[in-house]
């Protein structure tokens, strides 16, 4: 709210940035042709450029340009990392490794976002973005020096198999759409709810962000330990279903900080567990082209976030946090039903 604009206006800015994610399927094909190191470094460089634009932006429009560049180029890192895992880790162990990488992501949220919040409270949000640029530059050097630049490993031949998402695999893509729809409902309204209902400032919001980082850390560690044992599809369904009681808790306890936060924590625990469990499945959708399958899944997730960035902010302004909470719970149920149907159809084939 540093630009003194309404939440719905900011929602449109987020929507514009999320549109860049529609390039994920195309980006996935490119990543499958690049070395893992090049795709990851490219993503980090672009993310630093996007954060820089956002930090110096004089208006919401330029801010939207910055976060759009960030969202667009970050895909290269995400897809490159996913392709590296797919090329080096057997499928029956992939849930563990993806869970570990997502644990690192949760630690980044736990520490990085919290530090950015404290920096913002002490200075302003532009300095917070500058700190993010510094972290990205350090990450570039780490990846460049530690990841080899060898060409991609091609596994067994699939010359007769279409190198695209086909058939029942689209159910996995739609599941990611539903999961990200459910998550975005609270991602874009959680902070505003705390500000409006309980008068949270930047420092207290940073503490709340730190707490969410702990929740995501628990979910990622749990996924790395359980997803391969329970099965990817079952784990996705369980996580999606957990969103439902979280949304209901928040809806019923929106005027109580304790009850509301319990609902939020349950909500994000389910979301994070489901999405981490889905990523290893996404890398196997297209034989020999993990980036392509992952790209379609991430693109569907982007579509979900883009749509809900507008819908959720308008629901919040009309009904308070109850509207987004119930909408998110509905999409959690839809995601669980979709992945269960995928599992049932695959079991028959």
Where does each model-flagged region fall?
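Central cavity-lining transmembrane alpha-helices of secondary-active solute carriers
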Residues: 15-27, 210-219
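Conserved MFS/SLC helix-loop-helix module at the cytosolic interface between two early adjacent transmembrane helices
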Residues: 23-55
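Cytoplasmic helix-loop-helix junction between adjacent transmembrane helices
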Residues: 68-103
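Short amphipathic helix-loop junctions that connect adjacent transmembrane helices
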Residues: 1-7, 188-203
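Helix-to-loop junctions at the C-terminal end of transmembrane segments
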Residues: 24-35, 219-231, 316
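C-terminal transmembrane helical hairpin of 12-TM major facilitator-type secondary transporters
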Residues: 233-278
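Helix-loop-helix hairpin linking two adjacent transmembrane segments in secondary transporters
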Residues: 101-144
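A late C-terminal transmembrane helix in Major Facilitator Superfamily
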Residues: 290-317
């Amino acid at each position: 709210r540093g630009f003194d604009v309404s939440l719905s206006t900011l929602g449109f800015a987020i929507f514009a940035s999320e549109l860049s994610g529609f390039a994920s399927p195309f980006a996935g094909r490119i990543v499958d042709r690049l070395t893992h190191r090049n795709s990851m470094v490219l993503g980090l460089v672009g993310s630093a450029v996007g954060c820089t634009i956002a930090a110096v932006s004089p208006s919401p429009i330029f801010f939207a340009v910055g976060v759009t560049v960030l969202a667009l180029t970050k895909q290269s890192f995400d897809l490159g990392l996913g392709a590296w895992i797919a090329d080096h880790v057997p499928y029956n162990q992939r849930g563990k490794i993806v869970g570990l990488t997502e644990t690192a992501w949760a630690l980044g949220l736990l520490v990085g976002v919290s530090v950015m919040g404290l920096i913002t409270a002490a200075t302003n949000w532009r300095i917070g973005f500058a700190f993010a640029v510094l972290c990205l530059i350090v990450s570039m050097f780490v990846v460049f020096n530690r990841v080899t630049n060898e060409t991609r490993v091609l596994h067994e031949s699939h010359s007769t198999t279409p190198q695209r998402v086909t058939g029942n695999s689209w159910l996995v893509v739609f599941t990611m759409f539903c999961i990200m729809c459910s998550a975005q409902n609270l991602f874009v309204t959680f902070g505003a709810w705390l500000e409006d209902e309980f008068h949270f400032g930047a420092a207290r919001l940073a503490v709340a962000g730190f707490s969410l980082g702990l929740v995501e850390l628990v979910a990622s560690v749990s996924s790395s330990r359980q997803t391969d044992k329970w099965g990817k599809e079952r784990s996705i369904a369980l996580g999606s279903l957990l969103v439902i009681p979280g949304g209901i808790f928040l809806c019923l306890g929106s005027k109580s900080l304790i009850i509301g936060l319990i609902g939020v924590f349950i909500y994000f625990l389910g979301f994070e567990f489901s999405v981490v469990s889905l990523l290893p499945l996404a890398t196997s959708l297209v034989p020999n082209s993990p980036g392509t399958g992952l790209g379609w899944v991430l693109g569907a997730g982007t579509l979900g976030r883009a749509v809900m960035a507008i819908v959720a902010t308008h629901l919040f302004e009309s009904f308070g946090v109850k509207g987004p909470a119930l909408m998110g719970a509905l999409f959690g149920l839809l995601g669980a039903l979709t992945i269960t149907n995928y599992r049932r159809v695959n079991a028959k084939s």
